Amino acid sequence: MEAPGIVWVEESVSAITLYAVWLPPRTRDCLHALLYLVCRDAAGEARARFAEVSVGSSDLQDFYGSPDVSAPGAVAAARAATAPAASPLEPLGDPTLWRALYACVLAALERQTGRWALFVPLRLGWDPQTGLVVRVERASWGPPAAPRAALLDVEAKVDVDPLALSARVAEHPGARLAWARLAAIRDSPQCASSASLAVTITTRTARFAREYTTLAFPPTRKEGAFADLVEVCEVGLRPRGHPQRVTARVLLPRGYDYFVSAGDGFSAPALVALFRQWHTTVHAAPGALAPVFAFLGPGFEVRGGPVQYFAVLGFPGWPTFTVPAAAAAESARDLVRGAAATHAACLGAWPAVGARVVLPPRAWPAVASEAAGRLLPAFREAVARWHPTATTIQLLDPPAAVGPVWTARFCFSGLQAQLLAALAGLGEAGLPEARGRAGLERLDALVAAAPSEPWARAVLERLVPDACDACPALRQLLGGVMAAVCLQIEQTASSVKFAVCGGTGAAFWGLFNVDPGDADAAHGAIQDARRALEASVRAVLSANGIRPRLAPSLAPEGVYTHVVTWSQTGAWFWNSRDDTDFLQGFPLRGAAYAAAAEVMRDALRRILRRPAAGPPEEAVCAARGVMEDACDRFVLDAFGRRLDAEYWSVLTPPGEADDPLPQTAFRGGALLDAEQYWRRVVRVCPGGGESVGVPVDLYPRPLVLPPVDCAHHLREILREIQLVFTGVLEGVWGEGGSFVYPFDEKIRFLFP
């Protein structure tokens, strides 16, 4: 029975963002949030809708992960973010607070009005007295609405004092310069007002372009009208708990649902400056409640993050997706489709809020405890014994070399994510009421989509470790169950002529007791092993009440005749029949490392192809000759690239190579915006002292640098090669001595 006074409309929703946050009168432990819903009807016409939710301080603390946050504190931050002229980058102060607030408000929306979905037909029930959507249901009309893109190209010259950047980095060692730039702009917001800016936005029906020598003055170049791009819409509302009726003034996108920007040249300060200009222009006239102006992304974290994104939490009200500028056209389209699908599947909250898209951090311990209590004793014991430093399957202690013998690599693709979803379902009773059901259903949907959708796999690859980081008990549970699964794999393997020799998590490899010359028998044994291992894992999970939405599927990832291992993670697999190979555990940190890997793989082929006849001493001597020749070739080829800083540059994450940056690096302007996590460093010799690391991406092209310290880079790469070759000598011949390439004595003179 439908509630009286509610008007129902059938529309789809393309984005949900924060508009305003406040404390009701005489209340300190509960906040109210007004959400802006960008909708369109069956004819494609855009509509502005709003919904209101209430959030208690305890809910906010659950999503924050600690009691160090309150409703008044969140309201103060949101209120400050409505004035971008004075505070254009409020989330920089506490990005975790904004993640918690956004995730908490979305969860409250589903809890208080019904289950939402983006780009699918919905029945929205709104109250004419308040102007607010109060109920939502799935509609039956038509297929999902296809998301529509608008291409965004924006460049801005935001002059930031290099000394201010240097000061921010000095205060936070290891800080990424994208964050340092935003922090400096936050501290001096006037520099955003004086920025020069050029923007072009192309939709299916319009082209909008503006150029400003400074945002403090009108544009010097204009193409298209702002009204062709957006509609400025005012809606009168009477929110609950608000002392008076308010007017919301929003932008409605015309003919598109999101912006797409080229990621390689993407600049968060440029986009913030553009949106700040729009916010100032649209809300220059009085009479409307100013909306929240807040964003998240790796540039808002001191040490950044490996995934590039720009999350719009408030104004202008729809998302911006970034794709690599160098991506081929078809690849770029796939990336954009994946970004839109991720946005729809997670209500626009991924990756900004992380695992909070499923459950708040403080909800996972109860789920983990409930799930663990439902396991059989053997699994409970495995969970209790498991430790993060526990070794994985490792029958062959490195260094080792085997072959010719049939070996194969297998993987239960996506098993960890499937187990997380199944364990969460098993422990759902540990949640208070039904507060986590929508998030758990969302996790199930991601797991179901993962086999066919790369975007879903990408979400799960980051969601699982993020959830485990938020809850050590969940990490313990998932690690213990994975260990029990690995034990089941080992026990089953012996019955199918298979010995598991190594692996990590759901991926493992092993040897088959089959005639090395009988390829047909090997194929049959591999298929028998796959079926038996798959069935045994399914059975043991089912016996413990762990029922993944999709039955775990085991896939062979390669068949080989030789294996060389040199460390717990380093291994080279080779099939001498078709010359296919697979290398793991060798660092590919740059072009020079990749060249070294190719030379090394070629040398391993030459060594293993040599006949075993003759005294072992001669074989060892010949192998050492091949190894030294390989190193010679690599070093001589590298000599030809001695002036190429791009070739020698090495990719480093935060904390690995945090040498003091040269002061010239802080003068790179917008180039610094791209340093959001990784830093490519090359060692150069400025003269008069030791070599120093220079971040090559912070300087304009063509690079003008002191001579590259090739010897430094070569020693590091040769150290990795020597580790592999030493493993071959010990694994094949039991040779006790290590392989050491005489770089300094033999060829160092080439690199002064």
UniProtKB/Swiss-Prot annotation:
Keywords: DNA replication, Host nucleus. GO terms for biological process: DNA replication; viral genome replication. The keyword Membrane does not apply. Coiled coil: none annotated. It holds the Pfam family Herpes_HEPA. It comes from the Viruses. It is found in: Host nucleus. GO terms for cellular component: host cell nucleus. InterPro entries: HSV_HEPA. Belongs to the herpesviridae HEPA family. HAMAP family: HSV_HEPA. Component of the helicase/primase complex. Unwinds the DNA at the replication forks and generates single-stranded DNA for both leading and lagging strand synthesis. The primase synthesizes short RNA primers on the lagging strand that the polymerase presumably elongates using dNTPs. The primase-associated factor has no known catalytic activity in the complex and may serve to facilitate the formation of the replisome by directly interacting with the origin-binding protein and the polymerase. Associates with the primase and the helicase to form the helicase-primase complex. Interacts with the origin-binding protein. Interacts with the polymerase catalytic subunit. This is DNA helicase/primase complex-associated protein. The lineage of its organism: Viruses, Duplodnaviria, Heunggongvirae, Peploviricota, Herviviricetes.
